[in-house]
């Protein structure tokens, strides 16, 4: 079973922490157990040298990384870089390790940020000289979990995919707000205004009332036949509301048709 990409992997070892604990002095040792660590790096070489030097230590000498070795290194004229002075002063173990790494060339890992008790940032870099390094990647140790920082390409790709999704969703919703009229062309739906709706309702009710009153008014008698016809029409209109509504709808449609013919088409 193949492992997922390293920038999608989370690694932790509760057993290791239960045995040794996790603090700034041994966070690089904890990191060296993860799949992010390169076993051919200079850190592994220094670690092997330290193990052999401790086994072959003569009486009176101190192993690599001890306080006496650090004092000797400082007395030998090793000057810490300006951006590393704080960590070198607070954590002598890392100062001694970086002193040894500065003598070598190749891949190495150093501690660049400490926020105890649960955050450390480790940097992978290529060393080409005592003061010449190239940053390759950063790793985060948050609590007991180790993560690899994503690349700029992955970050931009993720942001573009997210932007594309939301933009497509917005355009699909915007497309639902467009309506088309033969006389005026395409246009956006206007938001419903409560004031306009109430005015339109009042106008409609007023027009209906006027039409009803006008229909119920008797006309002068011009003859028996006309009087009977008008009375029958008024009675039918006042009794049958559906017929009155049909008459009103016909009148409104005639006005809308006249307005559409006179209107200038507006295209978007």
Curated annotation (Swiss-Prot):
It comes from the Eukaryota. InterPro entries: Mediator_Med6 (IPR007018), Mediator_Med6_fun (IPR016612), Mediator_Med6_sf (IPR038566). It is found in: Nucleus. Pfam families: Med6. The keyword Hydrolase does not apply. Transmembrane segments: none annotated. Residues 220-245 are annotated as: Disordered. One of its GO terms (molecular function) is transcription coregulator activity. GO terms for cellular component: mediator complex. Gene3D superfamilies: Mediator complex, subunit Med6. Residues 227-238 have a biased composition (Low complexity). Keywords: Activator, Nucleus, Transcription, Transcription regulation. One of its GO terms (biological process) is regulation of transcription by RNA polymerase II. Its main location: nucleus. Component of the Mediator complex, a coactivator involved in the regulated transcription of nearly all RNA polymerase II-dependent genes. Mediator functions as a bridge to convey information from gene-specific regulatory proteins to the basal RNA polymerase II transcription machinery. Mediator is recruited to promoters by direct interactions with regulatory proteins and serves as a scaffold for the assembly of a functional preinitiation complex with RNA polymerase II and the general transcription factors. Component of the Mediator complex. Belongs to the Mediator complex subunit 6 family. This is Mediator of RNA polymerase II transcription subunit 6. It comes from Kluyveromyces lactis (strain ATCC 8585 / CBS 2359 / DSM 70799 / NBRC 1267 / NRRL Y-1140 / WM37).
């Amino acid at each position: 079973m193949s492992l997922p990409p390293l920038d999608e992997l989370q690694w932790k070892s509760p057993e290791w922490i239960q045995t040794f604990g996790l603090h700034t002095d041994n966070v690089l040792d904890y990191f060296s157990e993860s799949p992010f660590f390169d076993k051919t790096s200079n850190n592994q070489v220094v670690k092997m040298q330290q193990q052999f030097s401790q086994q072959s230590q003569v009486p009176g000498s101190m192993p690599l990384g001890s306080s006496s070795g650090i004092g000797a290194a400082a007395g030998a004229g090793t000057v810490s870089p300006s951006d590393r002075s704080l960590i070198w002063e607070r954590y002598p173990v890392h100062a001694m390790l970086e002193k040894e790494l500065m003598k070598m060339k190749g891949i190495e890992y150093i501690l660049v940020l400490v926020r105890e008790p649960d955050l450390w940032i480790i940097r992978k870099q290529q060393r080409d000289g005592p003061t010449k390094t190239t940053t390759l990647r950063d790793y985060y140790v948050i609590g007991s979990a180790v993560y690899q920082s994503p690349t700029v390409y992955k970050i931009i790709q993720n942001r573009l995919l997210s932007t594309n999704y939301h933009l497509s969703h917005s355009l699909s919703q915007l497309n639902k707000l467009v309506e088309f009229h033969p006389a005026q062309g395409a246009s956006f739906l206007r938001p419903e205004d409560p004031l306009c709706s109430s005015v339109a309702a009042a106008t409609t009710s007023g027009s209906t009332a006027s039409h009803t009153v006008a229909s119920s008014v008797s006309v002068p008698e011009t003859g028996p036949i006309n009087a009977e016809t008008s009375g029958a029409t008024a009675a039918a209109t006042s009794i049958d509301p559906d017929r009155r509504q049909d008459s009103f709808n016909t009148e409104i449609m005639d006005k809308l048709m006249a307005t559409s013919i006179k209107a200038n088409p507006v295209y978007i």
